[in-house]
């Protein structure tokens, strides 16, 4: 890619991407535009501006994407009750398509002919960033330094930074032994002692949540109001999507909710252990299934459950911008038209317990479902014919001697 003139770099301001910035300038003799996204990671993003300026960057983008992230990516994903491999709520995966989108938008605005990212050659993020970029701008060039250079250790990165006078923080604060990634939906931890699948994670690793043992001894009750499958209010107070998730993170974290320790199957072929804190997302998943339980038709709910693993894999593997994900999303969104109402939850020492749900669009009919006298709302004698018709094929097979014993 010797003809690269301008590159948009996904820039955090940390050691890795600061080294990448200088490496791009030296290796490709190109202009670098930096893009730093505020996705609610809880860290100040403005210092990235000063670091980029110190490295000679003229065009610097620092964007607050929290509302767009939750409104256009997190909420649509939760309408599907999305879980990867039964447990993972896709906190990292769902952030990547937005970053890819913004990288391409900035490339178009600035006339850049390439984008670059700091994802390693071992992980899923390289796939997610690049699939998104190619889907949105087929001819874009992508530079992935971790697949090109020989700076394959933190020590080598530090040496490069010192040699090239790259500004890096040196202070007495203890650095986390884990590789961490955070946004408004979750915080992830990988590496360190977690690479031994038998070793228990350390309690002081967790940043957002109290341990269930240290959580309050009295439960916290909350009410979530839904409109078309999305939460619009907590305890009757209207909130924006980002405000909803931030508040649920706070409440959930106080009650020890949302910790996860899993070994997942990466798209690139390896197994990887990760620990995740997703307090707000854990609450949202439980509550959304509760409001759907009274507002969705049975077959619609079951079909959604059958399609969800495919939808989850598409997001995990980086296919958010694919036509098949878009097709599934349209179906999912159509199912949410009547998913309105209120869910009441009890949060207690790591548990999310549904204690009530109500909706003007509820399909629950107490007159039919009652165990008491129903006044003729349901004729129990009808069940006999229903059962016989559904047993017909099995009765015929049994009559031919095709029994199971």
Curated annotation (Swiss-Prot):
L-aspartate binds at residues 120, 124-125. It comes from the Bacteria. It is found in: Cytoplasm. The keyword Ligase applies. One of its GO terms (cellular component) is cytoplasm. PROSITE patterns: ARGININOSUCCIN_SYN_1 (PS00564), ARGININOSUCCIN_SYN_2 (PS00565). Its main location: cytoplasm. GO terms for biological process: argininosuccinate metabolic process; L-arginine biosynthetic process; urea cycle. Pathway: Amino-acid biosynthesis; L-arginine biosynthesis; L-arginine from L-ornithine and carbamoyl phosphate: step 2/3. InterPro entries: Arginosuc_syn_C, Arginosuc_syn_N, Arginosuc_synth, Arginosuc_synth_CS, Arginosuc_synth_type_1_subfam, AS_cat/multimer_dom_body, Rossmann-like_a/b/a_fold. L-citrulline binds at residues 88, 93, 124, 128, 179, 188, 264, 276. ATP binds at residues 10-18, 37, 118. Keywords: Amino-acid biosynthesis, Arginine biosynthesis, ATP-binding, Cytoplasm, Ligase, Nucleotide-binding. One of its GO terms (molecular function) is ATP binding. Its EC number is 6.3.4.5. It catalyses: L-citrulline + L-aspartate + ATP = 2-(N(omega)-L-arginino)succinate + AMP + diphosphate + H(+). Belongs to the argininosuccinate synthase family. Type 1 subfamily. Homotetramer. NCBIfam families: argG, PRK00509.1. This is Argininosuccinate synthase. The lineage of its organism: Bacteria, Pseudomonadati, Pseudomonadota, Gammaproteobacteria, Pseudomonadales.
